[in-house]
């Protein structure tokens, strides 16, 4: 599960650590890959992958990559703007806004991203591959594609009331 740390106002979550190997003439060379998620709990979130011969070095590289790779998410209070389906590779993630008090109903990788972003009420379901890297990327694709009614109205040149119907 995700390991959580607070650092300079950012919530850092460790999603997964995997041991990988490279086969050479003399045998195998083992190294570690880490997948981390970083967020401020207020709509900014990023993810990163790091690879090194030691676990702490891989985690540190992943955290630095996550801080460089942050996006801003338009939230509707403590939930999402609208239901969204996003995919990356064979992973598909469905995210739906939920009423106050519902909580974050999500699996490990999706939960880490949404909690780091500051989402408090959401329903999610993963379909297809549950590879943590692809699930995190699919979640990011969904959050990036989500737009507020204000943005949609400005893009179409209409009022927010016309958009919401």
From Swiss-Prot:
The keyword Metal-binding does not apply. Residues 10-73 form the S5 DRBM domain. The keyword Ribosomal protein applies. InterPro entries: Ribosomal_Su5_D2-typ_SF, Ribosomal_uS5, Ribosomal_uS5_bac-type, Ribosomal_uS5_C, Ribosomal_uS5_N, Ribosomal_uS5_N_CS, Ribsml_uS5_D2-typ_fold_subgr. Belongs to the universal ribosomal protein uS5 family. This is Small ribosomal subunit protein uS5. Keywords: Ribonucleoprotein, Ribosomal protein, RNA-binding, rRNA-binding. The gene is rpsE.
């Amino acid at each position: 599960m995700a390991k959580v740390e607070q650092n300079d106002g950012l919530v850092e979550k460790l999603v997964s650590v995997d041991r990988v190997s490279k086969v050479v003439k003399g045998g195998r060379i083992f190294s570690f890959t880490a997948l981390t998620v970083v967020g401020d709990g207020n709509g900014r979130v990023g993810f990163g992958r790091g690879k090194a011969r030691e676990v702490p070095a891989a985690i540190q590289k992943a955290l630095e990559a996550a801080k460089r790779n942050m996006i801003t998410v338009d939230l509707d209070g403590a939930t999402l703007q609208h239901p969204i389906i996003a995919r990356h590779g064979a992973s598909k993630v469905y995210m739906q806004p939920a009423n106050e008090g519902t909580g974050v109903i999500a699996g490990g990788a999706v939960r880490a991203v949404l909690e780091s972003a500051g989402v408090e009420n959401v329903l999610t379901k993963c379909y297809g591959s549950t590879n943590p890297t692809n699930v995190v990327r699919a979640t990011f694709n969904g959050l990036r594609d989500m737009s507020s009614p204000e943005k949609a109205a400005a893009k179409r040149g209409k009022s927010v009331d016309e958009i919401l119907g």
